[in-house]
């Protein structure tokens, strides 16, 4: 629960400037992380020392539900001559380490990221006659922050977020988000590490799909060229009724050419998915991955879970060559989730050594597998095949209901434990499937109707007996079962 109020001390927008005129005890009274971010806000808005802000009534570190302590809201006059309209500028406080005393984030030093390493911003076009900023963007930012805190997945520029609902709960076509660097907020170095500022950009469904099929950065560049769709500063207009492709049909050609030339930069998604080892007898429940009702999958230990997460994170990192690194016990920063080139899955900023479970060291070769996806995840299979594997890359589906994962790899990917001789291989609940270019082309032909999901009914099954591979597209309820 949050409240709207003008910011006054000790909120993040009220302290005096640091320097000779600052009170001697100020540094000890005002949290240094807050002070550093406020300094950047004050640089940008020197005439708005006390902006309106949405404040968490019960702070997250006191058991409240909202991870962001504050969201400050500034009035930005834009630049009419540069096609930048007047707008509201929202800035979060809480994804980075504001306090440095481990109440929320573990302090890991001054050289790395502060907390999760970023704060969110959002630019909303100001409507004529609007005297105060709408507060719904603050709740949107809280929702994204909850996702980050709960999943430990971070965001990076070019990432996209599938929201499937108007951002302001209206009838708007703006129902999804891309993320980019804020055009005005500069990274700041705090006593607890570095903080960058990632701006939320509202987009239509068609624009989200293009970002998935190509890459987020490419679509962001197109949005910058269309003033009504964002312009140079990527300002969200919730009243925009047309996609950039309806405004300028030639932009679709640029996307198509980009996909053909570059492939897709989307290397993985969080998804409703599962897999079964069909070469094992059904009564062997120890390693079953079945999601059928009545089957209880084996629960992973905490160490197993962390090891798989780390391996997935490392496997999703973007390298100059497509590489899936071997399982390693060393934790380090990296990236995953519905994302972009440098995927976002920061699963820990500290370095610690974990015991590698025996099951994860041992690779199991499988003779026959059954892949299961919900409709939304299944619709991305052609993207995985055409935009990733045909370009010598890999693509991972990470289950949102557990630690299970499915990684498709091409023959050009190094470090994969699936090989042409044994194309289906598993480390615990992580399955890798190696597909040759010839088989990818065959699958694309057979899966053509996935690009028009409204034309088929669930459940839908595809099978390649000669390859001992089966793919099922299933209703969401199958994955939502508490027994899964």
Curated annotation (Swiss-Prot):
Q: Which domain of life is it from?
A: Eukaryota
What residues form the membrane-spanning segments? none
Q: Which UniProt keywords apply?
A: Acetylation, Cytoplasm, Developmental protein, Isopeptide bond, Nucleus, Phosphoprotein, Ubl conjugation
Q: What happens when the gene is disrupted?
A: Complete embryonic lethality at about 10.5 dpc due to defects in neural tube closure, abnormal somites and abnormal heart looping. Heterozygous mice are born at the expected Mendelian rate and are fertile. After 1.5 years, they develop a skin phenotype characterized by ventral alopecia, increased pigmentation, with papules and nodules on paws and tail.
Q: How is it modified after translation?
A: Polyubiquitinated at Lys-257 by the SCF(FBXL17) complex, leading to its subsequent degradation and allowing the release of GLI1 for proper hedgehog/smoothened signal transduction. Ubiquitination is impaired by phosphorylation at Ser-342, Ser-346, Ser-352 and Thr-353. Phosphorylation at Ser-342, Ser-346, Ser-352 and Thr-353 prevents ubiquitination by the SCF(FBXL17) complex.
Query: From start to end residue, where is composition biased (Pro residues)?
Result: 12-21
Task: Spell out which residues are annotated as carrying Phosphothreonine.
Answer: 353
Expression across tissues: Widely expressed in adult and fetal tissues.
Positions carrying N6-acetyllysine? 303
What does this gene product do?
A: Negative regulator in the hedgehog/smoothened signaling pathway. Down-regulates GLI1-mediated transactivation of target genes. Part of a corepressor complex that acts on DNA-bound GLI1. May also act by linking GLI1 to BTRC and thereby targeting GLI1 to degradation by the proteasome. Sequesters GLI1, GLI2 and GLI3 in the cytoplasm, this effect is overcome by binding of STK36 to both SUFU and a GLI protein. Negative regulator of beta-catenin signaling. Regulates the formation of either the repressor form (GLI3R) or the activator form (GLI3A) of the full-length form of GLI3 (GLI3FL).
- Which family does the record claim for this protein? Belongs to the SUFU family.
Q: What is this protein called?
A: Suppressor of fused homolog
């Amino acid at each position: 629960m949050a409240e709207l109020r003008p910011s006054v001390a000790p909120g993040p927008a009220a302290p005096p400037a640091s320097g000779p005129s600052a009170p001697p005890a100020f540094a000890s009274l005002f949290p240094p992380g807050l002070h550093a971010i406020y300094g950047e806000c004050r640089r940008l808005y020197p005439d708005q020392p006390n902006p309106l802000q949405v404040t968490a009534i019960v702070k997250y570190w006191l058991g409240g539900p909202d991870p962001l302590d504050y969201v400050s809201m500034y009035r930005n006059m834009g630049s009419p001559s540069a096609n930048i309209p007047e707008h509201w500028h929202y800035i979060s406080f809480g994804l980075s380490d504001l306090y440095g005393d481990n109440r929320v984030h573990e302090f890991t030093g001054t050289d790395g990221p502060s907390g999760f390493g970023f704060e969110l911003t959002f630019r909303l076009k100001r409507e004529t006659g609007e005297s105060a900023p709408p507060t719904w963007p603050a709740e949107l930012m809280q929702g994204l922050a909850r996702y980050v805190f709960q999943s430990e997945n971070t965001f990076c520029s070019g990432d996209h977020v599938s929201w499937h609902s108007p951002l302001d709960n209206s009838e708007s076509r703006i129902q999804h988000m891309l993320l980019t660097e804020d055009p005005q907020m500069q990274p700041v170095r705090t006593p607890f590490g570095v903080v960058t500022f990632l701006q939320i950009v509202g987009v239509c469904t068609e624009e989200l799909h293009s970002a998935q099929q190509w890459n987020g950065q490419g679509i962001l560049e197109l949005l910058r060229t269309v003033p009504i769709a964002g312009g140079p500063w990527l300002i969200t207009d919730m009243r925009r009724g047309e996609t950039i492709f309806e405004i300028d049909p030639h932009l679709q050609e640029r996307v198509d050419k980009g996909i053909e030339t570059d492939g897709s930069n989307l290397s993985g998604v969080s998804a409703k998915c599962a897999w079964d080892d069909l070469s094992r007898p059904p009564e062997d429940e120890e390693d079953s991955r079945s999601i059928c009702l009545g089957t209880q999958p084996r629960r992973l230990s905490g160490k197993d879970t962390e090891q798989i997460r780390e391996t997935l994170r490392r496997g999703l990192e973007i390298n100059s060559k497509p590489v899936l690194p071997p399982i390693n016990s060393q934790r380090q920063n990296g990236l995953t989730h519905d994302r972009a080139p440098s995927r976002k899955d920061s699963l820990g900023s500290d370095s610690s050594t974990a015991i590698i479970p025996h099951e994860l060291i041992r690779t199991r070769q499988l003779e026959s597998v059954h892949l299961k996806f919900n409709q939304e995840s299944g619709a991305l299979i052609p993207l995985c095949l055409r935009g990733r594997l045909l370009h010598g890359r890999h693509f991972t589906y990470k289950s949102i209901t557990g630690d299970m994962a499915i990684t498709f790899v091409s023959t050009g990917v190094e470090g994969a434990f699936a090989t042409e001789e044994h194309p289906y291989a598993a480390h615990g609940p992580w399955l890798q499937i190696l597909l040759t270019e010839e088989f990818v082309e065959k699958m694309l032909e057979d899966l053509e109707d996935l690009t028009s999901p409204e034309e088929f009914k669930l459940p839908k099954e595809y099978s390649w007996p000669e390859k001992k591979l089966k793919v099922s597209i299933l209703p969401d309820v199958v994955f939502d079962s508490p027994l899964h």
